[in-house]
Design a protein with these regions (language model features):
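N-terminal nucleophile
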Residues: 18-254
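Positively charged n-region of N-terminal signal peptides that target proteins for export
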Residues: 1-4
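Bacterial N-terminal signal peptides
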Residues: 6-17
Length: 254
């Protein structure tokens, strides 16, 4: 009986939409990389981030459908700026999702290959829900502890030195340090793309921690493993400051 209840619990989580989620998109003008990081209480968040190196990146959460991510990239590819792309995705979105919610429960951010960004937070998203644009980044969250979760991501990204992946990691850790997801942690992911990369869609990094109650710890461990296997990353001066103390960094500015 106990085993059955545990199975039903996790089965319920598997069909739960990405409510109670925070994410950030960032741009490195030095390298041209565009990346995203996300953490949620659901078992997997691999459907949140969508990116192409020569186009941009989308983070769709709240009541996500893969179509929202693909649509965002399609509109960027067609020449729309992020703000117009956000409007087009919202106006063309399905009213009902597979989980019975409306597009007004959706939250998504779009960043183009130049680092310009825009976002939409639906009026029916669970509090706290909101987004904030920073320097070369945009952060968003729904059903998180407070607005400090979102602003903390922006602050950590802006003040952490080093490669884009470490700045994104620092932002996720800062979000958790400021209260994070109100329903806990179970998954995290990071995706980085770059125009000119030989990999499909320009992907240079694609890592995830699923079904893990300490997903950010696992994600940072994966980054460390990547760094050890990459001569360029290991020899970089910026490797000395990789935001490893970000998990203890709370929002300092008003």
């Amino acid at each position: 009986m106990k085993t059955r209840l545990i199975f039903l619990f996790f089965l319920g989580l598997l069909v739960t939409p990405c409510n109670a989620t925070y994410s950030i998109l960032g741009f490195d003008p030095r390298t041209g990389e565009i990346g995203g990081g996300v953490q949620s209480c659901v078992p997997t968040v691999t459907m949140v981030l969508h990116g192409e190196g020569d186009v941009g990146m989308v983070a769709a959460q709240g009541r996500p459908r893969p179509e929202y991510g693909r649509a965002g990239l399609k509109y960027l590819r067609a020449g729309l700026d992020p703000l117009r792309a956000v409007r087009a995705v919202h106006e063309g979105g399905f009213f009902f999702t597979p989980w019975g919610g409306s597009k007004y429960e959706m939250q998504f951010a779009i960043m183009d290959r130049l680092g310009r960004a825009a976002a939409y937070t639906g009026p029916q998203c669970s509090n706290y829900a909101g987004h904030q644009i920073g320097r070369h980044c945009i952060a968003q969250g729904n059903l998180v502890e407070s607005s400090r979760v979102v602003s903390g991501m922006v602050y950590a990204f802006e003040t952490t030195k080093g490669p884009l992946k470490y700045r994104l990691m620092a932002a996720l850790e800062a979000a958790q340090a400021n209260g994070g997801d109100r329903r806990g942690m179970m998954s995290a992911a990071m995706l980085i793309v770059k125009n000119g990369s030989k990999e499909k869609n320009g992907v240079v990094l694609d890592i995830a921690e699923n079904m893990n109650f300490l997903p950010l710890v696992g994600l940072r461990a994966q980054l460390s493993k990547v760094a050890r296997s990459s001569p360029f990353d290991a020899s970089s001066d910026t490797r000395k400051d990789n935001g490893s103390n970000a998990s203890n960094t709370k929002l300092r500015r008003p």
